[in-house]
From Swiss-Prot:
Any single GO BP term: translation
SMART domains (UniProt xref): Ribosomal_S10 (SM01403)
Matches recorded under PANTHER family: 30S RIBOSOMAL PROTEIN S10 FAMILY MEMBER (PTHR11700)
Organism in which the protein naturally occurs: Geobacillus kaustophilus (strain HTA426)
GO cellular component: ribonucleoprotein complex; ribosome
Family: Belongs to the universal ribosomal protein uS10 family.
GO MF, any single term: tRNA binding
Subunit structure: Part of the 30S ribosomal subunit.
Protein name: Small ribosomal subunit protein uS10
Biological role stated in the UniProt entry: Involved in the binding of tRNA to the ribosomes.
This protein's UniProt keywords: Ribonucleoprotein, Ribosomal protein
């Protein structure tokens, strides 16, 4: 028998709200009777931007800024219709990007 699985991928710049959102999803899925695997931390994506501090010259004087994208993966195995319904009603912060695969 093939097992059904919902894979949820979360992305955010702030790891605290990402972990809170992941905890809400896991708690909601467990309450509805589904088996949950995760949250699994995925590698953090780090983007570095280098700009010149001065406008015209002084090429040796530069400043670097970085942007970190934190990611988590949650698998919900054998979800019930109640699980899917409760996940659809879940209210998550606006800074979290959610990608769901069935």
């Amino acid at each position: 028998m093939a097992k059904e699985k919902i894979r949820i991928r979360l992305k955010a710049y702030d790891h605290r709200i990402l972990d809170q959102s992941a905890e809400k999803i896991v708690e909601t899925a467990k309450r509805s009777g589904a088996k949950v695997s995760g949250p699994i931390p995925l590698p953090t994506e780090r983007t570095v931007y280098t700009i010149l501090r001065a406008v015209h010259k002084y090429k040796d004087s530069r400043e670097q800024f970085e942007m970190r994208t934190h990611k988590r993966l949650i698998d919900i195995i054998n979800p019930t219709p109640q699980t899917v319904d409760s996940l659809m009603r879940l209210d998550l912060p606006s800074g979290v990007d959610i990608e769901i695969k069935l």
